[in-house]
């Protein structure tokens, strides 16, 4: 009883201060201290030993140790109560959080100050540089004007970059549109070519080239008359020269054989003479008269070019190219009598020559009406 009262009397005044000091000096590692013991040990010793002197010595030693702990505090010393540990733990966490917050504030403030100082130093350097440059040129400017001009240049540069980017985007859109139009045009061209090819497949060769037959006929006539080989430019020139006095196209009554023979046989000779009329001098050429001509020399190469080979009263000597160059005209054999001429014959048939053709099983006598 006395020991308990003495302990409370000795430790009552410093109880609050001791608790606060333990809370404030608690270390991060929170393990229990190595103190001598507590009130449960005293009760156990006094009950089991029942020794008065031993109990007094233990109480005295306990009080001395507790007093020494209060005078000489240790890093790990506390009374072992859970309340003190929890309060110390909370305070330590708060203190660490506070230290962390304070450090962050300090670093933030230091960065701000450093940024301001650097900006001020740069401003001073710019001012010094501008003043020196303007002093040479006889001008004085402040750093604010220089910074304003720099900001204006930056804005202009940004505006130019924006315009360039917009132009690039517009150009990309235009190129895409042009590419789309080109694809549409190419598709249309392909469809047109397919349609033309389909149409050409249905057209006959003669319908594709309307002058093909006429050009070929003119080329054959040119080759037969001049003896020259076939060339395209001669064909075109012959066609151009013969288009003026082109003979009328054959009627439907003529057969295929008539058309094939009409290419080789000229239409200058009539198979029978016409009776004389009042206008013979105007219509009848004086080449084919019924009176025989006096004999002349043999025809030469110049005679073929100058004198037309029409209505000769004597047969020509046979040659290898009679079928190509010499038409079978004006033979001496007389023709059988035919029907009397009519008024239409004078309009359609020129009274040029009286000719006779030898009878051949593969040929026919042709009269050009």
Curated annotation (Swiss-Prot):
Residues 151-170 are annotated as: Disordered. Pfam families: NPIP. Belongs to the NPIP family. PANTHER family: NUCLEAR PORE COMPLEX INTERACTING PROTEIN, NUCLEAR PORE COMPLEX-INTERACTING PROTEIN FAMILY MEMBER A2-RELATED. This is Nuclear pore complex-interacting protein family member A9. It comes from Homo sapiens.
